[in-house]
Amino acid sequence: MYGIEYTTILTFFVSFIILDYTIKTLTRAMDFIIYRFLLVVVILSPLLTAQNYGINLPITGSMDTAYANSTQEENFLVSTLCLYYPNEVVSELNDDSWKNTLSQLFLTKGWPTGSVYFNEYSDIASFSINPQLYCDYNIVVVKYSTELQLDISELANLILNEWLCNPMDITLYYYQQTDETNKWISTGTSCTVKVCPLNTQTLGIGCLTTDTETFEEVATLEKLVITDVVDGVNHKINLTTATCTIRNCKKLGPRENVAIIQVGRSSTIDITADPTTMPQTERMMRINWKKWWQVFYTIVDYVNQIIQVMSKRSRSLDAAEFYYRV
């Protein structure tokens, strides 16, 4: 009996020694593998690069104070700037290397060669309806035009903000605007818009719903119309549907990576004083018209101050994606 007990104890003791030895062996092997792996990582780390997915903090500021002509010390190595201008610029400058000249001048303000893009447009009205704004920062240069002098605030409103729009069936339905961010936007070759406000019994207020001649005319033969009526009141709408389309639009918010520079003479209507564009006045500037070279020199001088009141692109390469959605 004692022999069996001694044998059991001896077996247990030997098993314990073997288990302890096995664990220590595995521990030494794991330590060897881990330390070798860390050594390889340390050696290769300086040779590897990786993408840093950080958070883009918006650039904020105020342009209530006078602009200062400054040169940015650090380069905008990860930013792009698009400058949009009317196509008449090319013919007036008559210089095949004007873009290269401006690129070199932007370089003195901290914008590397290749980070500034020049894009021309033929018609500011068409451009504002479907703006293709591809850069981190976008500056739109708008020259004063007598044909569009009363539309410039509406154009600025379209460019500086993102809109969500849906088609309207004015032959079947009455429409009302819910708040100040709700507008009716009409576009086409010739838009004449008339409205008839309705009371709670759907009877015309100062007009007859059956006679469009009694409707109030809010726009005549225009290419772009942003109609703003009394909120919370149903309206019957009459429109030249053959040459114009109308959409019910909601302003989603500002395009904070877009700024407008208005170029004009002393008689130019100042859009920065318009109540429809007042919330964006810090992203609207005016340059008195002289020559296009003078305009561009001024833009180069003050580009960094303009950028400081803008926020870098954060949602889409194509701003039109947020414009007309059906």
UniProtKB/Swiss-Prot annotation:
The record lists Ca(2+) 2 as bound by 177, 228-229, 231, 301
Q: Which residues bind Ca(2+) 1?
A: 95, 206, 214, 216
Q: What segment(s) does the record annotate as region GPR motif? A: 253-255
* Subunit structure, as described in the record: Homotrimer; disulfide-linked. 2 Ca(2+) ions bound at each subunit interface in the trimer hold the trimer together. Interacts with the intermediate capsid protein VP6. Interacts with the outer capsid protein VP5*.
- Paired cysteines (S-S): 82-135, 165-249, 191-244, 196-207
InterPro entries, A to Z = VP7, VP7_1, VP7_2
Q: Which UniProt keywords apply?
A: Calcium, Capsid protein, Disulfide bond, Glycoprotein, Host endoplasmic reticulum, Host-virus interaction, Metal-binding, Outer capsid protein, Signal, T=13 icosahedral capsid protein, Virion
GO molecular function: any one? metal ion binding
Which Gene3D superfamilies has this protein been placed in? Answer: Glycoprotein VP7, domain 1, Rotavirus outer-layer protein VP7, domain 2
Gene Ontology annotations for the cellular component aspect, listed alphabetically: host cell endoplasmic reticulum lumen; T=13 icosahedral viral capsid; viral outer capsid
Region (CNP motif) residue ranges read 165-167
Instruction: Give a short account of what the protein does.
Output: Calcium-binding protein that interacts with rotavirus cell receptors once the initial attachment by VP4 has been achieved. Rotavirus attachment and entry into the host cell probably involves multiple sequential contacts between the outer capsid proteins VP4 and VP7, and the cell receptors. Following entry into the host cell, low intracellular or intravesicular Ca(2+) concentration probably causes the calcium-stabilized VP7 trimers to dissociate from the virion. This step is probably necessary for the membrane-disrupting entry step and the release of VP4, which is locked onto the virion by VP7.
Q: What is its main location?
A: virion
Can you say where in the cell this protein is located? Virion; Host endoplasmic reticulum lumen
Concerning PTM, the database record says:
N-glycosylated.
Q: What is this protein called?
A: Outer capsid glycoprotein VP7
For this chain, the family text in UniProt reads: Belongs to the rotavirus VP7 family.
Do the record's keywords include Plastid? no
- Residues carrying covalently attached carbohydrate according to the record: 69, 238
Pfam families listed in its UniProt record: VP7
The cross-references to HAMAP family, in alphabetical order and at most eight, read: Rota_VP7, Rota_VP7_A
UniProt miscellaneous comment: Some rotavirus strains are neuraminidase-sensitive and require sialic acid to attach to the cell surface. Some rotavirus strains are integrin-dependent. Some rotavirus strains depend on ganglioside for their entry into the host cell. Hsp70 also seems to be involved in the entry of some strains.
